[in-house]
């Protein structure tokens, strides 16, 4: 079958799709990855075939222009709809309005959607897998009759929030599942998607938001309840297009507990800032009887006033190679870093401060596999004390090992491919372009 993956142009949101894309290719399926031109180099560096669509999203302008308002609205706010009192009607309406106006419509602007639909009409994919903010994928699928699903790399709290918001509005999901095919006037996301689909003469229903099903790479302990089908899949680390090289020093077992410090890749390549100063983090580890590996680029290093003797600075090292040698990790809360540490069984200190990073860190702490240190509460003493606890108390390592086992109990991307073949055959609204909709090895 033909499979089209699509993600807006940010590496952190694309990387989670690479292992499944390659599993599909290895099973004999044709795969294309569509995104704005800025992601083309990353797609091709992953060995995949890129389809540039639209123009590059102006994320830097968004952050500079309305970023303070967006970030202040979301910062340090849990997104867990199941926690009483967390998500007020005012917050949910503000979230829906702000995210649709300043983010969703920016990364799925009309030229991007039009180009993606045009490509899908010509190439006729059987299945479209879309990053959960890249609603253009759902639009293209509904226009062309392809089956479609969201590919999740982080807990699906955004969908829980949407259900909570629609319930507060007293609005049933539009379409066959419950509503009358129209959206509530205060449902900004639904209104925009209804208008966008209307440009192609296609009615809106809630599948344009939810997908027909989801492929979820998050362990079950972190998945909120879902009213849509979910295909669980093991997270397989792909740490981006940087050089995946094991340096000489990493081939030698550490003589002291090794701790990874990383503030992620997104802040290096975008206007989204790190909330915790690098200098503060390194001061917190100074003098401890540990070996610290800090992944910092030249700009981040320029902010340092002092490098402790127990700190090794490296520009880039693949986390999936580094973390198996580590006793702990201190990080910014990014989903890729968090997921890689989780599947490697490494206790974590996550300094999450926005969106789902807060809830992932809080849940990790509740499960005993790490500690959450909100970015606005980070001090040298507080971070040092938590790190000492993480290293000294065996319960953290044991809990992290349990989460690793949970993650490993999920099917691999290769094992998920036959499931996707069956679901595609069930949900595709047209006949396949040519015979052979399943791979030869599947009966």
Curated annotation (Swiss-Prot):
Catalytic activity: dTDP-beta-L-rhodosamine + aklavinone = aclacinomycin T + dTDP + 2 H(+)
Entry GO MF terms: hexosyltransferase activity; UDP-glycosyltransferase activity
Family matches, as Pfam families: EryCIII-like_C (PF06722), EryCIII-like_N (PF21036)
UniProt entry tagged with the keyword Zinc: no
Enzyme Commission numbers on file: 2.4.1.326
Keyword line: Antibiotic biosynthesis, Glycosyltransferase, Signal, Transferase
Region forming the signal peptide: 1-23
Function summary: Involved in the biosynthesis of the anthracycline antitumor agent aclacinomycin A. Catalyzes the transfer of the proximal deoxyhexose, L-rhodosamine, from dTDP-beta-L-rhodosamine to the C7-OH of aklavinone aglycone to yield aclacinomycin T (rhodosaminyl-aklavinone). It can also use dTDP-2-deoxy-beta-L-fucose, TDP-2-deoxyfucose, dTDP-4-amino-2-deoxyrhamnose, TDP-L-rhodosamine as sugar donor and epsilon-rhodomycinone as sugar acceptor.
Name of the protein described by the UniProt record: Aklavinone 7-beta-L-rhodosaminyltransferase
Gene: aknS
């Amino acid at each position: 079958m033909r499979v089209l993956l699509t993600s807006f142009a940010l590496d952190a949101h694309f990387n989670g799709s690479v292992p499944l894309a390659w599993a599909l290719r290895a099973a004999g399926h044709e795969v294309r990855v569509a995104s704005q031109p800025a992601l083309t180099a990353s797609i091709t560096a992953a060995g995949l075939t890129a389809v540039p669509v639209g123009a590059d999203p102006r994320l830097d302008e968004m952050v500079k222009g309305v970023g303070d308002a967006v970030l202040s609205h979301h910062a340090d706010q849990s997104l867990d709809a199941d926690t009483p009192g967390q998500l007020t009607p005012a917050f949910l309406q503000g979230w829906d309005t702000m995210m649709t106006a300043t983010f969703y419509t920016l990364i799925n602007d009309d030229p991007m959607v039009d180009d993606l639909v045009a490509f899908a009409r010509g190439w006729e994919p059987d299945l479209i897998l879309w990053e959960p903010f890249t609603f253009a994928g759902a639009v293209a699928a509904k226009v062309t009759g392809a089956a479609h699903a969201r590919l999740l790399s982080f807990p699906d709290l955004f969908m829980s929030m949407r259900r909570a918001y629609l319930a507060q509005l007293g609005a049933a999901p539009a379409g066959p599942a419950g509503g009358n095919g129209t959206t509530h006037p205060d449902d900004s996301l639904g209104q925009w998607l209804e208008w966008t689909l209307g440009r192609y003469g296609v009615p809106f229903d809630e599948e344009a938001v939810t997908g027909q099903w989801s492929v979820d790479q998050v362990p079950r302990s972190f998945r909120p309840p879902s009213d849509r089908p979910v295909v669980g899949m093991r997270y397989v680390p792909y740490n981006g297009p940087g050089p995946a090289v094991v340096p000489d020093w990493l081939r030698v077992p550490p003589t002291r507990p090794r701790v990874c410090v990383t503030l992620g890749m997104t802040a290096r390549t975008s206007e989204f800032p790190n909330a915790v100063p690098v200098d503060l983090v390194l001061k917190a580890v100074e003098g401890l009887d540990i070996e610290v590996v800090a992944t910092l680029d030249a700009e981040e290093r320029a902010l340092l006033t002092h490098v402790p003797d127990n700190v090794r600075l490296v520009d880039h090292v693949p986390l999936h190679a580094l973390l198996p040698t580590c006793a702990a990790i201190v990080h910014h809360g990014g989903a890729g870093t968090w997921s890689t540490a989780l599947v490697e069984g490494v206790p974590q200190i996550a300094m999450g401060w926005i969106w789902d990073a807060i809830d992932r860190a809080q849940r990790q702490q509740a499960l005993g596999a790490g500690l959450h240190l909100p970015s606005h509460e980070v001090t040298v003493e507080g971070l040092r004390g938590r790190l000492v606890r993480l290293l000294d108390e065996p319960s953290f390592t044991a809990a992290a090992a349990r989460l690793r086992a949970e993650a490993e109990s999920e099917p691999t991307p290769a094992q998920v491919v036959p499931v996707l073949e069956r679901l595609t055959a069930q949900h595709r609204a047209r006949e396949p372009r040519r015979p052979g909709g399943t791979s030869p090895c599947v009966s």
